[in-house]
């Protein structure tokens, strides 16, 4: 939508983002980021297109953390609200649901929160990302584990890894990246678990970790999975030389768990 305003003309962007449901915390971070960007761009004079200058605004709807709802709202934004430029939702699953809609209408979508590699193997022409894909998220952690082994006079192949991942496209892509990196270095994966759908208990995995004593524990389950992991690692007194985890910031583990966040 290109509309007139009191100052400059306006470009309206559309976004279906989670304000309720399991991604509500991450959705809040997403909208905060989008709003900050729009505010700063407008403060600096807006966006110049040709010989005209436009201010930006965003039309939001709550996708309720549900892919089907996200797809419905993308249809609404484009076909009813007349949106010509979209911003992505939070999560790979929601992005995967919305991308076919924006593709169908030829509406560009810039997304910063759908990192699953599978999003970028579909041949989409109107999907643009500004982040690393998920299989790269923990590559540096596995490389660090190899370096730590070498500083202790050990081979990287001596490193044992325990893993627990949510069963969603993002987390499974993170898992695939960890597995590939570990295999390339000859590391042994001693635990390869799937987190429960509710993401509220990983004690079964942590019991195995205590028994097998791996060198590295890797966890990816979005904000709720990170919070559960930090809480139960402390409760069960699980001692692992190195822990690599996604979504610690969005889970607010320092604020919520204090010293247990550094257990």
PLM segments and residue spans:
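Sec/Tat signal peptide C-region and signal peptidase I cleavage site
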Residues: 2-8
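Short coil-to-beta-strand
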Residues: 8-14, 108-112, 220
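Signal peptide-proximal N-terminal region
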Residues: 32-58, 150-154, 183-187
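Surface-exposed amphipathic alpha-helices with a cationic face
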Residues: 42, 78, 99-103, 146, ...
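Extracytoplasmic ligand/sensor domains, especially the bilobed periplasmic-binding protein
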Residues: 83-191, 241-263
